[in-house]
Amino acid sequence: MIRQLWTELNAAILFYTVLPLPQRWPTQFAGMSRWAPIVGLILGLILAVSDRLLAVGQFPLPLRSLLIVLLAIALTGGLHLDGAMDTADGLAVPNPDRRLEVMSDSHTGAFGAIAAIAIISLKTIALCYLPAPRSLLILLIPVWGRWAQVLAIVRYPYLKAEGKGAIHKQTGRGAIDLLPGAIALVLGIGAIARFHSLTVALQLLAIGLLWAWATGAWLQKKLGGQTGDTYGAIVEWTEALIWVSFTIGQV
């Protein structure tokens, strides 16, 4: 049992990031999607530590924030951002019957480029105004983004018979897949409540649940189902919208 969980986590790290793992470590890609939030926790830890190091190096806050956003993209190989771009191109097509075809096109259209600029800009600006505890929020928000992805996998049908995202739906175990991410979020939010602020902890819980549900639900309404691209879009937009929500009233 423990070996199976370990092999799934290894596969999730290889699939969702560019982080290297020893070749001798076993992998099992079936069922890996439930570990996406834990991968988000690993990425969040790298981002939070990097942010602190940049602060020690006295990098200006706007530059520091942009570098963190770019590092997040680099660590995933742009996987989720690419999905958000393809989704934007597809949604821009008036004819619903052609949306999946456009999303499958390897060429980036104008709306895809606009979506990428919007996501990077929103995240960077929001990070400049992110309240305390900044490091814990940077740590946990990537977990929320990927938990939202798992929620969409569990709740909604997959629109393609094949594709890079099909394995998520085909090998999922249902609502139980939400558990690893939920545990990570409960522990993280509990830490914020215990060591910093109950108010901030409750805000993170409420805002996270709102956008984790809303992004997938909105795409479901627009497309009638999900694809690998929409999973990426859910991750990116959930993160961006949570960060933006936390900046309201900070000026």
Curated annotation (Swiss-Prot):
Membrane topology: Multi-pass membrane protein
Co-factor(s): Mg(2+)
InterPro entries: CobS
A GO MF label: adenosylcobinamide-GDP ribazoletransferase activity
Keyword set, alphabetical order: Cell inner membrane, Cell membrane, Cobalamin biosynthesis, Magnesium, Membrane, Transferase, Transmembrane, Transmembrane helix
Localization: Cell inner membrane
Residue ranges of the TM segments: 29-49, 65-85, 110-130, 136-156, 175-195, 198-218
Domain of life: Bacteria
GO-annotated biological processes: cobalamin biosynthetic process
Catalytic activity: alpha-ribazole + adenosylcob(III)inamide-GDP = adenosylcob(III)alamin + GMP + H(+); alpha-ribazole 5'-phosphate + adenosylcob(III)inamide-GDP = adenosylcob(III)alamin 5'-phosphate + GMP + H(+)
The protein's annotated pathway: Cofactor biosynthesis; adenosylcobalamin biosynthesis; adenosylcobalamin from cob(II)yrinate a,c-diamide: step 7/7
Enzyme class: transferase
EC number of this enzyme: 2.7.8.26
PANTHER family noted in UniProt: ADENOSYLCOBINAMIDE-GDP RIBAZOLETRANSFERASE (PTHR34148:SF1)
Cited NCBIfam families: cobS (TIGR00317)
Family that this chain belongs to: Belongs to the CobS family.
Protein task: Joins adenosylcobinamide-GDP and alpha-ribazole to generate adenosylcobalamin (Ado-cobalamin). Also synthesizes adenosylcobalamin 5'-phosphate from adenosylcobinamide-GDP and alpha-ribazole 5'-phosphate.
Protein's recorded name: Adenosylcobinamide-GDP ribazoletransferase
Source organism: Synechococcus elongatus (strain ATCC 33912 / PCC 7942 / FACHB-805) (Anacystis nidulans R2)
Taxonomic lineage of the native organism: Bacteria, Bacillati, Cyanobacteriota, Cyanophyceae, Synechococcales
